[in-house]
From Swiss-Prot:
Note: The basic functional RuBisCO is composed of a large chain homodimer in a 'head-to-tail' conformation. In form I RuBisCO this homodimer is arranged in a barrel-like tetramer with the small subunits forming a tetrameric 'cap' on each end of the 'barrel'.
Protein name: Ribulose bisphosphate carboxylase large chain
Pfam family, one: RuBisCO_large_N
SUPFAM superfamilies named in the record: RuBisCO, large subunit, small (N-terminal) domain (SSF54966)
EC code: 4.1.1.39
Annotated positions of the N6,N6,N6-trimethyllysine modification: K14
PANTHER family hit by this protein: RIBULOSE BISPHOSPHATE CARBOXYLASE, RIBULOSE BISPHOSPHATE CARBOXYLASE LARGE CHAIN
Record gene name: rbcL
Record's keyword annotation contains Oxidoreductase: yes
Gene Ontology MF: a single term: monooxygenase activity
GO cellular component, one term: chloroplast
Length: 58
């Protein structure tokens, strides 16, 4: 039999899902000549925040 080993999670890693709105907004972003603007119309299902529905497209 092989010896058992213990696996530990990396330091700083927490399981779970972060709200997308916490990570997508970058107020200091400067546009570039190569940036492309795309627009999507998203209608969230009942009970789904608009930001999270938009994250599914992003």
């Amino acid at each position: 039999m092989s010896p058992q080993t213990e696996t530990k999670a990396m330091v700083g890693f927490k399981a779970g899902v972060k709200d997308y709105k916490l990570t997508y907004y970058t107020p200091d972003y400067e546009t570039k000549d190569t940036d492309i603007l795309a627009a999507f119309r998203v209608t969230p299902q009942p009970g789904v925040p608009p930001e999270e529905a938009g994250a599914a497209v992003a």
